[in-house]
Amino acid sequence: MLQKLLEANNLKFEDKFYEDCEVFVKLLQQWGTIHNLSGRLTRDDIYENILDSLYPLTFIEKYESFADIGTGAGYPGLILAIALRDTKAYLIEPRIKRVSFLNFVKATLKLDNLVVLCNRVEEVKDLQVDLITSRAVTNTSLLLDITKNIKKPNSSYLFYKGSMLESELENAKVNNYKIVNKKDRNYLYIKGLI
């Protein structure tokens, strides 16, 4: 059960959140099979991805806005938007099939805090956010470079990384960061780059 999994990781949400997640699970399973949105479509796999998406809420600050780069099937950006309904969320995804899915979930769940952009992040104009997130898109240096156009002077970053993080950081030239490890995931939290 999702609620037990999240609460075991110090994440607590209202009942509405869990109801919305169950709708998301069903929609992802339906769309995912037809449109190849994700390779992991069992309920347990989706629950693990939801936990992976939300776990950083246990250690990051609260932000007024965020943009998720390459949201794909919804991780982490869509899940964060469901959990943080008073935070303005932007999902930036260039693939039309995935954008259609994200917009369908947005409409179904009435996510008024959410904007889905069908674009590559480097082509996005007139958007600046407090937090930039990304999971499994590209290396840290390139992510920092291609997101310059959407960052504020003091934006923070949250990248969901794997085992190659240490070597990526050597090339990225960042400071004021924190790495939080959970299983095979390394969460890279970079506070307020200027």
UniProtKB/Swiss-Prot annotation:
Name recorded for this polypeptide: Ribosomal RNA small subunit methyltransferase G
Keyword terms of this UniProt record: Cytoplasm, Methyltransferase, rRNA processing, S-adenosyl-L-methionine, Transferase
Binding site for S-adenosyl-L-methionine: G70, Y75, V121, E122, R135
GO molecular function: rRNA (guanine-N7-)-methyltransferase activity
Domain of life of the source: Bacteria
Keyword hit for Cytoplasm: yes
Catalytic activity: guanosine(527) in 16S rRNA + S-adenosyl-L-methionine = N(7)-methylguanosine(527) in 16S rRNA + S-adenosyl-L-homocysteine
Signal peptide residues on this chain, from the entry's feature table: none
PANTHER family: S-ADENOSYL-L-METHIONINE-DEPENDENT METHYLTRANSFERASES SUPERFAMILY PROTEIN
Family label: Belongs to the methyltransferase superfamily. RNA methyltransferase RsmG family.
EC number: 2.1.1.170
UniProt keyword annotation of Methyltransferase present: yes
HAMAP family: 16SrRNA_methyltr_G (MF_00074)
GO cellular component terms, A-Z: cytosol
Gene3D superfamilies reported for this sequence: Vaccinia Virus protein VP39
Cellular localisation: Cytoplasm
Encoding gene (name): rsmG
Function: Specifically methylates the N7 position of guanine in position 527 of 16S rRNA.
